[in-house]
Regions:
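Peripheral docking tails and interdomain loops at the edges
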Residues: 3, 346-398
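Acidic/His-rich segments in extracytoplasmic proteins that coordinate ligands and/or metal ions
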Residues: 80-153
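Proline-aspartate-enriched helix->loop->beta-strand connector
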Residues: 94, 322, 326-331
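Redox- and metal-dependent alpha/beta enzyme cores, enriched for Fe-S-associated oxidoreductases
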Residues: 27, 38-56, 245-310, 314-319
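An N-terminal, globular interaction/scaffold subdomain
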Residues: 34-89, 93-95, 100, 108-109
Length: 398
């Protein structure tokens, strides 16, 4: 297939957290607000003259300094952010808005405040107290946290407009990006998709890490380009799979999987599109902030939720996504030492295979994908096993 017009430009943008578009927005007087978790509503960080940046630390090398401050037994994603912060890579930030969801990430982000890692006198760090259940009481608590620890500090420190009208405008702009990426994602359902998982991963990551008002036109143009794009006559993939798990902020992971012969047709991981790129529908009978809060709590698929309906809902979602996108198997991945996904992938991969009949493989990995020969071998073996199952099905065997 012909390369997408903006693919190379987007790839270059993802090489740095402080990329040229972030620099442009800051030069225009806008405030860069960093976050790392789905539970920090992205849309709230794009209200008024603010824009959201989901923190990444691309091209990270040694983690010696962050390991000194934390531990060798902490996931590399958390340590990479701290390492980059110590290097001075996040001095463009106006605030860091975090959630008490992952204790490892909390320890990493606390150091931004303790070590004064951002050279900005007005810079502040805030943590939301997150509930473990979704009830009317927990929604009220979540709304209160968002108001007291996000909206009010932004208004008091930077004079940000956090009125209901400003929130509605932010939701409308957020939904436009979501509609574009959702429509692009529909092409992944085709028998011979006209977009690869790597390309979609790039587009989605850019929407998380760059000011949306500076990329929405290019995303819209990319959608039009894809509508006209013809897929390769002979598919370059051998099987289609879903990837489920913890943070994948490195598109090199998706590239590695696809080079092994498995086309990634659906993603259910942090930094992915499910959840993350659904439109937010405001309930006219509820306050705007409560509608936003309910959206994020109810759509979250984080394994920190232990309600029975939430646990079973995560399994059923993966099953339904595989059916909808015609995925033949599921790759469950977990960052090494990830406290939540370490439990989730073990049980979920068993349930998906033995209860739902969908082949799966479970792997743990380092944050940096480059040169990971062991992971490549695991994926290749999984691809071959799926091909064997296909042949057996065609021959009527088991």
């Amino acid at each position: 297939m012909k390369d997408l017009k903006y693919l190379y430009e987007f790839e270059k943008l993802l090489e740095s957290a402080n990329n040229p578009l972030v620099q442009q927005a800051c030069a225009e007087g806008k405030h860069a607000l960093a976050y790392t978790c789905y539970h920090m509503p992205e849309v709230l960080l794009n209200t008024g003259d603010c824009f959201s940046v989901r923190l990444r630390a691309p091209l990270t090398g040694s983690l010696d300094i962050s390991s000194y401050y934390m531990s060798n037994f902490i996931c590399d994603y958390c340590k990479s952010l701290l390492e980059r912060g110590i290097e001075g890579g996040y001095n463009f930030l106006s605030a860091l808005l975090a959630t008490e969801t992952c204790s490892e990430m909390n320890r990493a982000l606390e150091h931004f405040e303790l070590l004064h890692l951002v050279d900005n006198e007005q810079f502040f760090v805030t943590f939301l107290d997150m509930p473990f259940k979704v009830t009317d009481n927990t929604v009220r608590h979540y709304v209160d946290q968002l108001r007291r620890k996000v909206l009010e500090p932004l208004h008091e420190v930077y004079g940000v407009d956090v009125s209901d009208d400003a929130l509605r405008k932010a939701v409308a702009e957020h939904n436009e990006v979501c509609r574009i990426l959702t429509e692009i994602g529909q092409f992944r359902k085709e028998e011979n998709p006209r977009i690869t998982g790597y390309e979609y991963h790039i587009l989605n990551l850019v929407s998380y890490c760059c000011p949306k008002y500076l990329i929405v036109d290019k995303l819209r143009e990319t959608l039009e380009e894809l509508r006209r794009r013809e897929p390769d006559v002979k598919p370059r993939f051998r099987v289609k799979i879903a990837v489920v798990g913890s943070e994948i902020d490195d598109p090199g992971f998706t590239k590695l999987v696809e080079e092994a012969g498995a086309l990634v047709v659906v993603d259910r991981f942090c930094f992915g599109s499910t959840p993350g790129r659904e439109e937010i529908h405001l309930d006219p009978d509820l306050p705007v902030l409560e509608s936003i809060a309910r959206h994020y709590l109810t759509t979250s698929q984080c394994p920190r939720y232990m309600q029975r309906e939430k646990v079973e809902g995560r399994w059923q979602l993966v099953r339904d996504l595989c059916k909808e996108y015609h995925a033949q198997g599921v790759l469950y991945e977990q960052l090494k030492f990830c406290e939540y996904w370490g439990y989730e992938r073990a049980l979920a991969s068993h349930v998906i295979t033995h209860d739902y009949g969908i082949p799966s493989v479970a792997v743990d990995r380092q944050n940096a994908t480059g040169g990971n020969g062991q992971l490549r071998t695991r994926v290749q073996a999984f691809v071959e096993s799926l091909e064997i199952k296909q042949l057996q099905a065609q021959r009527g065997g088991k």
